[in-house]
């Protein structure tokens, strides 16, 4: 029986697929015993290989925090992946279309993002945790699937960059000691409408994010990171995207996607896509 591929070998395979803009069979198809601990070891190998070729970690994406989509994908718990300087687009660069031609089976997710202003810890309460957030913003993550038809197991998603393709962050709103308590309340239970070329495509509510809103996703991430000796701890200056507020919908070059937010003091966002 051949030896199971090493984390570095699997990392090379998924990075080759990423660079070649092609899809591959899920890791679990050839290795049914490939589990989440093994997948996060691959994720660490991917990070090291991406850093070796000049990319820099600038944040994290948390996926599958929206419980309403779990059955659709057969994944029933959150996962996370790194965000890189090559995949992040800040508000200062949102005036031009976002290229997606290098992504495979891309889908769009409206999300809430936080900027880390002080190092948070997993045992903090909501007040302490929000005090570590420098800003909050609304934006889009473009996710992708190296696996045809979006068919995979949870471990496959972790090995393949957490399905991350690109992160477009809207204009940040500072969180201050005077506004932190209000943000805790306002980020739970607000509504979002997702539109394609002006037509409503889906609706969501922030309470779908782990039942407690975006801050709950950050807390979950902190608990997972604390249990993983290979994972980099969250650092000041990182961006954390907390998971989709609606279903993840397929996108194509030439489309313009936008959102309307209600009951939260954040603007909607418009994002044009190009090849």
Please place each PLM-identified region on the residue numbering.
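Catalytic-core "active-site belt" of small-molecule-metabolizing enzymes
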Residues: 2-231, 256, 268-274
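Short strand-turn-strand beta-turns centered on an Asx-Gly dipeptide
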Residues: 196-198, 242, 262
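Conserved metal-binding segment of the jelly-roll/cupin
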Residues: 234-246, 251
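A short, acidic, flexible beta-alpha connecting loop/helix-capping segment that sits on the rim
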Residues: 246, 263-265
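Conserved, well-ordered active-site substructure
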Residues: 253-263
